[in-house]
């Protein structure tokens, strides 16, 4: 049995929904042995088969529970605003994308790897309304730009500095 075979077997028989939420982000690396696209496609198919055995409500519940757990354990405390882990932050957009991927991993092309490209593909496939697409796309764009700017100014932090911070 190969590593890929063992992984596929695990995904199809034992993987929990929270693991599938992580696995949908998996990408194959082509390090000279060839066949990376084939390996990635077979793993995506296994994720699709496994997720299709769950009903939408269960996937939604599990995705939300994991998102809230990350917020509780990582979000800024007190008066700080955390644009990644806090409510309304980047992870909200990422979890919507992962939830939609689990609903139908085959609805979008594997080449749609960025969050923006995936949101566009979900809208084109009718999985997101125009209103939801616009809100998610604009919010993601704004928060991504803000995150990049904060990293340039303050280093690796997803937390907005307080208004009375000396740097401000």
Which residue ranges define each predicted feature?
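A nucleotide- and high-energy phosphate-metabolite-utilizing enzyme signature
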Residues: 1-168
């Amino acid at each position: 049995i190969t590593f890929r075979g063992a992984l596929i077997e695990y995904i199809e028989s034992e993987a929990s929904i929270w693991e599938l939420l992580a696995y949908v982000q998996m990408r194959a690396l082509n390090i000279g042995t060839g066949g990376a696209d084939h390996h990635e496609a077979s793993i995506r198919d296994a994720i699709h088969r496994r997720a299709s055995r769950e009903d939408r409500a269960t996937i939604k519940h599990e995705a939300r529970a994991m998102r809230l757990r990350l917020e509780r354990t990582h979000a800024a405390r007190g008066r700080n605003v955390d644009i990644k882990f806090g409510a309304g932050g980047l992870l909200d957009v990422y979890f919507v994308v992962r939830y939609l991927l689990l609903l139908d991993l085959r609805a979008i092309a594997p080449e749609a790897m960025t969050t923006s490209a995936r949101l566009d593909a979900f809208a084109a496939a009718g999985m997101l309304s125009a209103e939801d697409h616009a809100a998610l796309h604009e919010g993601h764009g704004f928060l991504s730009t803000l995150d990049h700017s904060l990293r340039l100014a303050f280093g690796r932090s997803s937390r907005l500095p307080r208004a009375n911070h000396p740097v401000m």
